[in-house]
From Swiss-Prot:
Stated name of the protein: 3-ketoacyl-CoA thiolase
Source organism (scientific name): Shigella boydii serotype 18 (strain CDC 3083-94 / BS512)
EC main group: transferase
Catalyzed reactions: an acyl-CoA + acetyl-CoA = a 3-oxoacyl-CoA + CoA
GO biological process, one term: fatty acid beta-oxidation
EC number: 2.3.1.16
Pathway linked to the protein: Lipid metabolism; fatty acid beta-oxidation
UniProt-annotated catalytic positions: C99, H392, C422
Amino acid sequence: MGQVLPLVTRQGDRIAIVSGLRTPFARQATAFHGIPAVDLGKMVVGELLARSEIPAEVIEQLVFGQVVQMPEAPNIAREIVLGTGMNVHTDAYSVSRACATSFQAVANVAESLMAGTIRAGIAGGADSSSVLPIGVSKKLARVLVDVNKARTMSQRLKLFSRLRLRDLMPVPPAVAEYSTGLRMGDTAEQMAKTYGITREQQDALAHRSHQRAAQAWSDGKLKEEVMTAFIPPYKQPLVEDNNIRGNSSLADYAKLRPAFDRKHGTVTAANSTPLTDGAAAVILMTESRAKELGLVPLGYLRSYAFTAIDVWQDMLFGPAWSTPLALERAGLTMSDLTLIDMHEAFAAQTLANIQLLGSERFAREVLGRAHATGEVDDSKFNVLGGSIAYGHPFAATGARMITQTLHELRRRGGGFGLVTACAAGGLGAAMVLEAE
């Protein structure tokens, strides 16, 4: 066991997570069609503050993230402060760590709490796959800049005459890694082939995710942590996530064709997480501040870790790398955990990470550790379903996982929970949570 790193303030206070909330998650171009991420962020933070009944002036910092950036609102965090009635002097800045963005936001607020610069803050993220920054070609962009500097109409017309019809076509946001040109699904296919993850195994995990998420909603387990969203023109509210297929059968998954490697692939739209719109946020404060305000925390942040690996091959192994580090810093092992919640970007990626967490060879030869991190107990793993079912608004997923895990830990009488995710760029994140 390596060095334990307690997450406490100089006064010995633990980092308390006192409340968490999210919007329902909606598939791209459905319920939240036309609503930008900044509005989703305002929606969830405003409701979170209203439900918590914490005076706005108590919140000293807001750290928020957005992966699909909109040029007109580059600092989503500050726009949320200004648009929710929070104290105008509240410090606010934005972060981005791809699919682990709200993990990063939580870590940043925790670090401010430990440094003593604040006593309470909000962390979270929002993304919209329905409101996208549609760009223009590089040639058109250059011409537009030059036209802006041209002094006469003839100069402007001459510049425009250089353009061809193809130069006027809109350019959608990139779906591939900037450094490699690989799509996430291509990497998932790599992992499936390298580690022998079959189509049947992937479909089974996806089906399990949907069934458990549907059961969680049916049992009323999510009602406290998911707000009702009222959407213009306000005819019908969105109450639940609209991606969950509770009535599907395993046979339904087998009907879909591969989405990335059309000829030999096993990754399909059904065993991958869909493009999604939504927002989520949590309130963090020092343990003593929570006591002063008479608040009972959902739980505490015990440790966190971020890692990075090469992007050319199997880059979605973030959980396999970050989990042992987070556990080490918490002074725990896999067997100490009550719950394990892993982001399901793809069923193939999830199953490959589970495989490596239990691999002695990977631990010795790749991580340089004496023993495997540990086998993942299925009875503890993604017990309420995962991202394949709920959806994945990139910057919001981490806050969803944290809130969901803490509520479930409390229902079980407390314990330790691990939340972990892969992210674009070969990044990984893991956090250990504690509930009493």
